[in-house]
């Protein structure tokens, strides 16, 4: 699949997600149902929190943005690699960018979802494959990480130590816990100050 076809597919996925965020009556009802029940399996995942994450994702899935981003890289045409993605679950769909990067680079995404966020991705992956069926063989959800060529893993500091040990013989991109601060100017509205304060993310 050429890069232009991948860009078109993800742009259409962005349109699908935008319709959902705009509450289009023709949008995916399964995704709506999952969001409404999300707090029962992860109390941090409120409906507004999830919709905010989805909105941020679909805003970046524009053809111009994707083309500009990819133009900075030389993507070689070579045999596909199986890239295992071990996703975190601190923010809704936090592993989407890793998923996007793997598929855009022409490789296969072997995904192990976090137990804290193991529902939202499914209807999104199904929609992407519906848009572009050639992705069907390039996306696989797994419970056990095996049969891979490289690893992208995100987790706690303790998980990071395990990742380093278990994947020491493979190409890896490993992430552990981070902390950050926000700088306020004093001109923020109350709504802006409160926005996205919740969830166990690096900004808290």
Report residues per predicted region.
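Conserved small/polar residues in nucleotide/adenosyl-binding loops
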Residues: 197-204
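N-terminal Rossmann-like NAD(P)+-binding subdomain of aldehyde/semialdehyde dehydrogenases
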Residues: 1-84
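Active-site catalytic microenvironments for nucleophilic, acid-base chemistry
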Residues: 16, 127, 131, 201
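Residue-level marker of positions within ordered structural domains that often coincide
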Residues: 11, 189, 203
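Rossmann-like NAD(P) dinucleotide-binding subdomain of oxidoreductase/dehydrogenase enzymes
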Residues: 66-195
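Generic recognition of cysteine residues
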Residues: 21, 58, 101, 194-197
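Sparse, context-dependent recognition of short Cys/His-centered cofactor- or disulfide-binding micro-motifs
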Residues: 35, 42, 46, 92, ...
